[in-house]
Amino acid sequence: MRIRFAMLGVLLGGLFSIAPAQDRPPIRDNSFLVEEAYNQEPRVVQHISVLALTRRSSDWEYGFTQEWPLGSQRHQLSVTIPILNAADATGVGDIAVNYRYQLAFNDATGNALAPRFSVILPTGDADRGRGTSSLGLQVNLPASLGVHRSLVTHWNVGGTWTASARAPGGGRVATRDIAAAASAIWLLTRQLNLMLEAAWAREEIAIAADTRVAEESAWLSPGLRAAIDFSSGLQIVPGLAFPIGIGPSDGERRVLFYLSFEHGF
């Protein structure tokens, strides 16, 4: 509980940032469950940490992502490293190497489109539920739409194909996952945003040789984020959200902490 109040204090503190906010653009590329369609600006790198805690459980998930522009905003390379804890066992999951192409971008309206292609490396332990022990390919289509100068929406649809997922007891099978997500971001100020995100996924899990089962999940997540800008160009964005399980995930609750550092290089 103390951690939550401390994070809330930092978020509200974003209203009184160190650097003047008038010449700063509004917060854009800092979503939690939904992928926005804004690539990194030239010579600006972003380091993103997301920690999700499961209520009334010791399980947690942490993800670290680093994003770099490749020469310009049109091309972006990133790496996502997940660390998972379940049943008091902690380890690295399957690492994703991502390329994203800025197909369309309008700075004035906030409208953007940026398809992403990812290679998922078999770095996790399948026997402990932290990976598939197989190479995977993933595609996602993030679209961002500025509805109003104070309201931006983000939309995602994508899928993952795993060539030969390994079941915990042995045996392999190809799996296919699909996912969709959407969000509405209210720009309360340039440095403080209220968020409502929704995410749904259908994942196939290998349980034996040539045998898989499908599991669905659905979440509705209210949250907020704030920007703390420094005269050096460094921007720190802390965020807090409370994902609520709906439909197939009814009854599940999580607390999500977000922290981003963005700076030039």
Model regions: which residues?
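Cleavable N-terminal export/targeting peptides
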Residues: 1-28
